[in-house]
């Protein structure tokens, strides 16, 4: 399947659309594409609003703009889809992990993750390029002060990006 077919299929079938940020040093689009089944766990979410988006709103098959953040060229680096229901992020229980949470228990985990399946890589659409498009002015990633690692994207915004910028 070519990239256009993949994105048009997502536009037809996805219930919701998301932008998910990952630091390339932690997990890049290349890492995700090289993973078994092109699936990676979206670990390390430690913001309640982002966690709640995953827990309450994301479903298997939702479309994802895979966004590289905290790097030289932040921007959309690929397209993915959510590939599992949420489950406890095991790193919250590991005292050696930077994601350890001493208040979290196996019986009552605070932090969740889900699997994301990478579909394809694209030339990075940098944040400055996104800002140039009036059709994208409402995207949360473009709002001043937004630091959430997972944000909803309107279907029309997703469609504009995949049809005009990728």
Spell out what each predicted region is:
Residues 67-74:
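Short, charged beta-turn/beta-strand-edge "cap" motif at the junction between a beta-strand
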Residues 78-148:
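Aromatic- and Lys/Arg-enriched surface recognition patch
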Residues 1-60, 157-158, 165-166:
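Compositionally biased, charged N-terminal/linker segments
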Residues 21, 117, 151:
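Residues in well-ordered beta-strands of folded domains
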Residues 8-12, 56-58, 72, 105-108, ...:
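A general structural signal for short secondary-structure junctions and capping/turn motifs
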């Amino acid at each position: 399947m070519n990239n256009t077919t993949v994105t048009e299929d997502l536009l037809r079938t996805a219930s919701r659309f998301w932008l998910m940020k990952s630091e390339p040093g932690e997990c890049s689009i290349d890492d995700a594409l090289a993973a078994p089944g092109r699936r990676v766990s979206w670990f390390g979410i430690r913001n309640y609003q982002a966690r709640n988006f995953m827990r309450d709103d994301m479903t298997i098959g939702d479309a994802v703009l895979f966004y590289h953040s905290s790097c030289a060229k932040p921007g959309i680096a690929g397209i993915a889809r959510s590939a599992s229901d949420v489950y406890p992020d095991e790193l919250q229980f590991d005292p050696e992990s930077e994601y350890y949470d001493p208040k979290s228990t196996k019986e009552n985990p605070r932090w969740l993750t889900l699997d994301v399946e990478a579909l394809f890589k694209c030339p990075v659409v940098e944040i400055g390029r996104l800002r140039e498009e009036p059709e994208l002015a409402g995207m949360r990633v473009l709002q001043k002060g937004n630091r959430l690692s997972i944000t909803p994207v309107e279907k029309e915004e997703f469609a504009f990006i995949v049809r005009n910028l990728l």
